Amino acid sequence: VTIPASSVTESAAVLDLGCVLPFNFGHHSVSLTCRDFRRGDAVTEFVELTGGRIACEVFGEGPLVLLAHGIGDHRQAYRAVAPRLAAAGYRVVNMDIRGHGESSMDWVSQTGRAVISRTDVARDMVGVIRHFGGPAVIVGHSISGGAATIAAATAPELVTGIVEINPFTLLQKFSVPGFIRVRRYRQGMVRLGMAATGSLRWWLRYLDVAYASKPADYSASMAALASTLREPGRMAEFMKTESTPADAHAQLPNVACPALVIMGTLDPDFADPTAEGEAVISAMPPGIGQLATIAGGHYLHSEKPDATAELIVRFLATRVPEMQIH
């Protein structure tokens, strides 16, 4: 099932966080009661796992939703989405993936190498869900989209649904035609290649093109991220994430829970973002996944939080029975 971009609106109801969230989702109409919820209501908690600890912010009460960011980022990437989900009636756990943000460094990878693999992140996700008393729906961005696939396939009793935002789930192939013809893809690949040398400057330059439009707090959020990445050891941890997504790709046929893939049509990481999302869905069992597109870049949860949160809440309300709010 494909949800066209035209069906996604920047709903004033989501922005308002008042008493009702009315959504129109194709043939479905959903109204969810909510309460005012601010970022200041979050509680920070550190979850001790084998090999390290994961920093989490916890918002709200209700069915559990776990948020996980992408590489070279931190949990503040979901600063606008997490309160919206909590306001819609969910208990939201927003985690820093291993080596990032306030989570500990120097974890031992299941690969035996100095990397942070998708399987590593998936195992951390499952550990966090157990700690908070799952099951849960996982919302994963980029590398964490691939990790969500693995978690769903390997721990189906704990993962009742997955949302993958611009995921690196499939084995990637460099597109020569895309590099020649698609300017945003060319810009993204050049900057990513330079950032892979461990250059914070080039990573920030990549982020500048990865956002198709800038949220109002873009400068402040980038300054906060840069400050985190300048901490001793953080860039080295970031560089450990440059591993193959083969482990996630191989698990796509084993996903049994409902899945939503959200692609930004202006994402510079893919020559054709919509085709990438379609390929992720097609590798899952029939009827499992659906695709939605938003006119935005790689960081939809920061760039287009209203549309992104709306899609997630619709998915939870209409596709995941365990997430129904009564």
Each PLM stretch: what is its role?
Residues 87, 97-139, 310:
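Active-site loop/oxyanion-hole signature of alpha/beta-hydrolase fold enzymes
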Residues 55-106:
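Conserved HGGG/HGGXW glycine-rich cap/lid loop of the alpha/beta-hydrolase fold
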Residues 145-156, 162:
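Short glycine-enriched nucleophile-adjacent loop
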Residues 153, 161-193:
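Flexible "cap/lid" loop of the alpha/beta hydrolase fold
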Residues 173-174, 195-254:
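Conserved alpha/beta-hydrolase catalytic His-Asp/Glu region
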Residues 256, 260-296:
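Conserved loop-alpha-helix segment in the C-terminal half of the alpha/beta-hydrolase fold
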